[in-house]
């Protein structure tokens, strides 16, 4: 990620809200899926101030470079080779750490000895069970955080699993991603561009409006990115 651009994002349990992480700060958006009516609800503010439980952690000091939502008000957050499971307690100051911070390989032992052990670039929650897709460079893996296992036990290239990304900037990787509240839609971000992708588990993948510049279609981020 270039400094000042979106490092990580995750979908909130609150409808049409998502958290975006930039440098050591974050912003809470109503991202108004499929429209340009998105607006800032909170921020940009330092992670350590908005999430008091992270104040004395690596995430409070340096920020969050990957994240994905799980159940209820919970999410996994990452920074370099560390991760934690948090209750982010939307619209309250009651956030807490449930697990960690621990090394990625300690929480997800199947990543030991793989490219994901040293850090994860982007991730999004699938609509299938407790599955999540994680990205590192031009590779991706599918995991099940319920059974804590890698699905199919293989790491694949983005170009093979996401043919819609061939010959785009996303073929070589993504900086951030999050699953929309609209079923089977995912947003991917890289530097000053984004793509909205239709993802049908086991089915076809398609970029919905092409790869676009964030500044043209996200009025809420226009004055924030780059931060």
Curated annotation (Swiss-Prot):
Its main location: cytoplasm. Keywords: Calcium, Cytoplasm, Metal-binding, Repeat, Seed storage protein, Storage protein. Disulfide bonds: none annotated. This is Albumin-2. It is found in: Cytoplasm, Cytosol. The keyword Heme does not apply. May play a role in response to oxidative stress and polyamine biosynthesis. The monomeric form binds one hemin per monomer. In the dimeric form, about half of the dimers bind one molecule of spermine each under physiological conditions. Ligand binding is mutually exclusive as binding of hemin leads to dissociation of the dimer.
């Amino acid at each position: 990620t270039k400094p000042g651009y979106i490092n990580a994002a995750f979908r909130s349990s609150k409808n049409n809200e998502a958290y975006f992480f930039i440098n050591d700060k974050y912003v809470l958006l109503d991202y108004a899926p499929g429209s340009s009516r998105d607006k800032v609800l909170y921020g940009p503010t330092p992670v350590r101030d908005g999430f008091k439980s992270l104040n004395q952690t690596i995430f409070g000091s340096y920020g969050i470079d990957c994240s994905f939502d799980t159940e209820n008000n919970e999410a996994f957050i990452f920074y370099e080779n560390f991760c934690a499971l948090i209750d982010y307690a939307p619209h309250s100051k009651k956030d807490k750490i449930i697990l960690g911070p621990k090394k990625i390989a300690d929480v997800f032992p199947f990543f030991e000895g793989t490219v994901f052990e040293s850090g994860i670039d982007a991730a999004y929650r699938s609509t299938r069970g407790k599955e999540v897709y994680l990205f590192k460079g031009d590779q991706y893996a599918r995991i099940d955080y319920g059974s804590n296992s890698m699905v199919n036990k293989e790491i694949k290239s983005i170009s093979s699993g996401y043919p819609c990304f061939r010959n785009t900037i996303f073929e070589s990787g993504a900086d951030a991603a999050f699953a929309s509240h609209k079923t089977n839609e995912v947003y991917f971000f890289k530097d000053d561009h984004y793509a909205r992708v239709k993802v049908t588990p086991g089915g076809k993948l398609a970029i919905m409006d092409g790869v676009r510049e964030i500044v043209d279609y996200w009025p809420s981020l226009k004055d924030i990115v780059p931060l």
